[in-house]
Amino acid sequence: MSLKISATKSFGRFNWKLYTALLLTAVLPTIYTTVRINYLGNIPGDWGFNIASQLAWVNLMLEVVQEALILPLFYCIGITIANREETINRVRTGMTVTLGLYLVFTVVILLFATQLTEWMAQNPDTISATAEYIRLEMVGTTLFSMVRFLIIVFILLDMKEHIYAILGIQVVTSIALDSYFLSDLDFSLQLGVNGIAYSNAIASFITLVYAITVFSRKMDMGFSDWKESHDYSWMGSWWDVGKYSGLDSFVRNIFYMIFIVKMMNVVEEQGTYWVANGFIWGWLLLPFYPLADLLKQDTSGPNTIDHKEKTYAYFGIATVMCILWIVTIPFWGTFVSEVLNASDYEKIVGLVLILLPFYILFSYNTLMDSVFYGKGRTELLAIQSIVTNVSVYGTAFILFKMDVFSPTLTTIALLFGTGIAVDSIVTFSMYRKLLQESNGML
């Protein structure tokens, strides 16, 4: 099959409607996150950014749980989505296990928030305030873990309108509550960064109630159906997929937390890095992650076709996104200074430009990872993570001990970028091997 024919068929079968729905679900949180960053920029000094940025290492820990539990659902529930009873059972039992694990994690954070904040080399003047903020954030985080679970189910059921609704509710409530708790408006309580935690908790509770109600109606479930006998026998298959996904995330995030996040705290650039990351993940990658989620869904079913017909559209759209990044560079400074309300915008944009080539590689890398998730081949993710992080960050540690590597904002960014580049090489080789094993069928 020629390249032109494969590309034409691939774009023809691409689920534009679901992609649009997923894109909107990504746009909406970005809007309230941007408003939130703008409000933080009005707090005198940089302590607001610095304290809020410390949730990053907590999120890295939570990401391990999420990638071990939530992302494998594309495969574990995707293979039974046509079976009502089995789907209900997997959602019911899966949410129970997820909630239990998040609660355990929350208790650990509540008990050791201060010690962990000190270990991450946060400014001593803000350790107490940071620990308090992190403890408050765990309420909303635990509630929203259940929402994430149900969003995966809604994606598999192609319930676009309810994906819109969930994020719409989250945006409206978050902006309204941030304005009341955080902003410098006349009616605001002006609670500082803690206002973010209160907003997240209330918004997460409201969206969770909506998501559970929608799923119950879709499956014609009453309250008693949620309490009926739970069959946990499928946990073995969930564990088989999730253990490698979790291992991948654990290795990747522990190295990132120590060598990137902690080092940024040491050189006192955590606020700069947090805003730059917010711009990259909130805006540059905005249209990309819905694309990756759609590819997970597209490759999770039992029916296979030629990989060119299935994936060319995804890689083509990713290429267009990368071109748009380059075209919009002249406008980044204005956006960061005016919209994100960051005074040190030149340093932030400079950091983003250093990372840009690596994030172009990252975009293709993540699409290949999405195929691994969709096919339940998470052991490949674990292998690439171990190889990449041990080789790159292990080398950096040796060079640091030899006084060859000196941590600065630029060198830390280049270290992170090198990790992405090496990971991309490893991922491509494994993706090629997967295609050979499947005779090019996905």
Regions found by a protein language model. Name each.
Residues 1-20, 129, 189-201, 209-253, ...:
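Interhelical loop/hinge segments that connect adjacent transmembrane helices in multipass membrane
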Residues 172-208, 338, 390-424, 433-439:
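Membrane-interface helix-loop junctions in multi-pass transport and translocation proteins
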